[in-house]
């Protein structure tokens, strides 16, 4: 899920209390008719050694097409893009959709590698994948963890990022800002992060991963009538043996409760300065973003050609809930560069 301080830092503390209904532990809207996905799988899947990982990824489109890398979030997987990929492939793009570390068929190459979920580690995985696939430059797009990783790639490696599509805007984690408390209603919205901070939370997530993540799906997208088959296709990725360790570390690291690795210290120092994103970019917001929906608060952090789009009636999983709109953003921003 997104940065716990987004609503207060970006939209003001007073407004933050109303912004978190989508991720609060009790949903206020329950869809009555499940909506099946248009597609259920990808053209093909592959594996490649890349950096610290053996990365599993879905692919579509011509091998010589302009590359687009689509990054999923938590608790989701590559199937968030199952309807986006063929739309982009039909326009001639080479589409790569990797399972992030801790998801699906992606595995650590060494048992001794720390199961790190910090932002610099996940973003560096993207660069390693591009190197392994001999992709010098790509359009990078994502939501949730994937948007954060895409933002980091665009900010720290602009020479590798042709253009950017980021749901919820500028999501680079600010560890210092994360130390400050939010108003009670806003804190309530981030209940799962505090749950993960406890031994009980880690044990509970390990024991109930399937049902826990389905609850997050429902609460983050209260008007999306996904069916069980749609959820179960993604839920298979949560059985990855490293999934719980990576997820728990990610959220504890964000709260300053778990250290990152020294190898990423320089990257994190650069990210702490909130570097501007200079590449062409389209940001997308949805109902999940609450008072930050207009994107005004992070507009100054995008200094290249830029557009912000608002999708009303859509929850957090934008590419799966609104695949045409997401694909259109990728197609348009690619044309700017």
Give the residues covered by each predicted segment.
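Short, hydrophobic alpha-helix immediately C-terminal to the catalytic nucleophile
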Residues: 82, 151-155, 327
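Conserved acidic functional residues
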Residues: 26, 73, 144, 320-321
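Catalytic active-site module of serine/aspartate enzymes centered on a nucleophile-bearing elbow/loop
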Residues: 307-337
């Amino acid at each position: 899920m997104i940065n716990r301080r987004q609503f207060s830092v970006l939209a003001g503390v007073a407004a933050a209390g109303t912004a978190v209904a989508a991720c609060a532990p009790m949903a206020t809207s329950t869809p009555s008719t499940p909506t099946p996905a248009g597609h259920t799988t990808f053209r093909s899947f592959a594996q490649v050694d890349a950096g610290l990982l053996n990365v599993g990824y879905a692919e579509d489109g011509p091998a010589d097409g302009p590359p687009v890398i689509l990054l999923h979030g938590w608790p989701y997987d590559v199937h968030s893009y199952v309807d986006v990929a063929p739309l982009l492939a039909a326009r001639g793009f080479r589409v790569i959709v990797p399972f992030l570390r801790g998801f699906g068929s992606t595995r650590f190459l060494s048992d001794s590698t720390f199961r790190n979920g910090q932002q610099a580690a996940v973003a560096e995985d993207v660069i390693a994948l591009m190197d392994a696939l001999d992709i010098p430059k790509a359009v990078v797009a994502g939501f949730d963890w994937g948007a954060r990783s895409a933002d980091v790639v665009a900010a720290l490696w602009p020479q590798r990022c042709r253009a950017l599509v980021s749901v919820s805007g500028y999501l680079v984690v600010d560890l210092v800002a994360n130390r400050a408390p939010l108003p009670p209603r806003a804190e309530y919205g981030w209940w799962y992060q505090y749950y993960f901070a406890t031994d009980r939370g880690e044990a509970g997530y390990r024991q109930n991963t399937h049902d826990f993540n389905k609850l997050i799906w429902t609460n983050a997208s209260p008007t999306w009538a996904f069916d069980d088959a749609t959820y179960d296709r993604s839920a298979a990725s949560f059985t990855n043996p490293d999934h719980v360790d990576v997820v728990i570390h990610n959220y504890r690291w964000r709260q300053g409760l778990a250290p990152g690795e020294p190898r990423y210290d320089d990257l994190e120092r650069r990210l702490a300065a909130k570097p501007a994103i200079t590449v062409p970019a389209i940001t997308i917001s949805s109902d999940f973003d609450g008072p930050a929906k207009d994107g005004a608060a992070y507009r100054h952090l995008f200094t290249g050609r830029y557009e912000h789009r608002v999708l009303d009636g859509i929850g957090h999983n934008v590419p799966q809930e609104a695949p045409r709109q997401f694909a259109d953003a990728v197609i348009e921003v690619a044309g700017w560069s």
